[in-house]
UniProtKB/Swiss-Prot annotation:
Homodimer. The gene is poxO. Hydrolyase; part of the gene cluster that mediates the biosynthesis of oxaleimides, cytotoxic compounds containing an unusual disubstituted succinimide moiety. The first step of the pathway is provided by the HR-PKS poxF that serves in a new mode of collaborative biosynthesis with the PKS-NRPS poxE, by providing the olefin containing amino acid substrate via the synthesis of an ACP-bound dec-4-enoate. Gene3D superfamilies: acylaminoacyl peptidase, alpha/beta hydrolase. GO terms for molecular function: hydrolase activity. One of its GO terms (biological process) is antibiotic biosynthetic process. It comes from Penicillium oxalicum. InterPro entries: AB_hydrolase_fold, FrsA-like, FrsA_esterase. Induction: Expression is positively regulated by the oxaleimides biosynthesis cluster-specific transcription factor poxB. Keywords: Hydrolase. Pathway: Secondary metabolite biosynthesis. The active site is at S239. The keyword Hydrolase applies. Disruption phenotype: Impairs the productin of oxaleimides and leads to the accumulation of a trans-decalin containing alcohol intermediate. This is Hydrolyase poxO.
């Protein structure tokens, strides 16, 4: 496949932005101009290139709206929102390495995206706030315009680095046109809850989704006109969002689950990228944390991708050192301490996918392990899809093949939620 950048990381993230083009989140020429202004592995040039395109698209949206052209305004605002997201993507704002640009850029995404909501032609959209412990989770509810009967609901979960405004370009742009209500939200460690509210990540996503389902029940009672069919609720997520979806699927109120390119055990992921001998010695107490921190700090100094990945994990876990991050990663597993799998609690149909050209995961050690742990469902209620080439969904999270993953997801959901067209 054609490469835009020497860096695998920058190349993947650029394709990620291009992937939003069919759904209004990018314009090809704008992206190519930005690419020409970006220096490989230079986060500052990445930021500058995308902020220029974001500001231009925002100005085009304002101009179109002023002249009454709501179609062009919607398209421009969607692009601007995605470009603002991209402009801040390489930055973190953790206590040990603060960056004052992070929150203002996140707010620009929110403000610009809010301008698109009344202009969307894919259905109705509204902003919600979901009570969760001592906080409120920001959410969007996307509804089909034609709701003569109750509609099934899809909960679209973000992952480690996505924000819910980006999720629009996947399921929220298509779901309402196919007769689904789609709810996106940001839980602990995600999006604005991390950047503004300083909520850090947690592994027990069944608790988070459980509160969301409680909220939807109350919301439906107070707003019956939304016509949500809470007997037909599905959950979908990609990468870490795929892990979250599998955790959430243990809730009996979930009627179907689509887990795109998940991991089974985050610690196994670490062992595939860091010397297992070193990790075992450290975990056994034979090698002190300061030594491991020093080794990982050298790796971060030598590679921007490593610096970004470890820095992001420290940020969303709320810790200050690589070894503290490793301790947190051990908690993110579908295995119980006794060796059994949490997936034995899942009773709903599950579609799980893998990507052989993933930037991060190995399908054989993750997706097949998930699929095998779902054997109790029987082959009629579990499905596996391992994609090998980029156009078939072979990149992580099916980046570059959004239309295909949307088609396969809703085909699976239609079948198991009894949706007919």
């Amino acid at each position: 496949m054609h490469r835009f950048f020497k860096s695998e990381f920058f190349n993947f993230e650029f394709i990620r932005i291009l992937s939003a083009a069919p759904y209004g989140g990018a314009e090809i020429a704008e992206c190519l101009v930005a690419a020409g202004q970006i220096t490989n592995d230079d986060p500052e040039s990445w930021h500058r290139a995308w902020i220029i395109q974001a500001d231009k698209a925002k100005a085009l949206g304002d101009e179109a709206l002023h002249s009454g052209d709501t179609v062009s305004a919607r398209r421009a605002y969607l692009r601007a929102s995605n470009y603002y997201r991209a402009s801040g993507y390489m930055f973190h704002d953790r206590p040990g390495a603060p960056d004052a640009r992070v929150l203002p850029l996140a707010q620009q995404v929110l403000d610009t995206y809010a301008l698109t909501l009344p202009l969307l032609d894919t259905g109705e959209a509204s902003q919600l706030k979901i009570p969760f412990e001592n906080h409120q989770l920001a959410a969007y509810l996307y509804l089909p315009r034609d709701r003569t009967k109750p509609v099934p609901v899809l909960l679209s979960l973000g992952g480690a680095d996505s924000i819910q405004e980006e999720l629009y370009y996947v399921y929220a742009a298509s779901g309402p046109q196919l007769g689904y209500a789609v709810l996106t939200f940001e839980g602990p460690g995600q999006g604005i809850t991390l950047r503004r509210d300083k909520m850090h990540m947690r592994p027990d996503w069944e608790v988070v989704v459980g509160r969301v389902l409680d909220f939807l029940t109350a919301y439906m009672q107070q707003n019956p006109s939304v016509q949500l069919d809470l007997s037909r609720v599905a959950v979908v997520g990609a990468s870490m969002g795929g892990y979250y979806a599998l955790r959430a699927a243990a809730d009996p109120r979930i009627g179907a689950c689509v887990s795109i390119d998940p991991f089974y055990d985050m610690w196994d992921f670490v062992r595939n990228h860091v010397s297992p001998a070193l990790l075992n010695a450290w975990n056994a107490g034979w090698v002190p944390s300061r030594v491991v921190n020093g080794i990982m700090s050298m790796a971060m100094a030598a590679s921007f991708q490593a610096k970004w990945e470890v820095g992001l994990a420290m940020w969303f876990f709320g810790v200050d050192s690589p070894t503290q991050t490793l301790r947190h990663m051990m908690k993110y597993t579908l295995a119980r301490a006794d060796g059994t799998s949490r997936l034995d609690q899942v009773k709903c149909p599950v579609l799980v996918s893998g990507a052989t050209q993933s930037l991060y995961l190995e399908p054989e050690s993750d997706v097949l392990r998930v699929f095998d742990a779902l054997a109790h469902l029987g082959d009629e209620r579990r499905e596996i899809w391992i994609a090998r080439s980029p156009e078939e969904g072979g990149l992580q999270a099916k980046i570059g093949a959004i239309g295909l993953v949307v088609q396969r997801t809703f085909r699976f959901l239609d079948q198991h939620l009894n949706v007919t067209r």
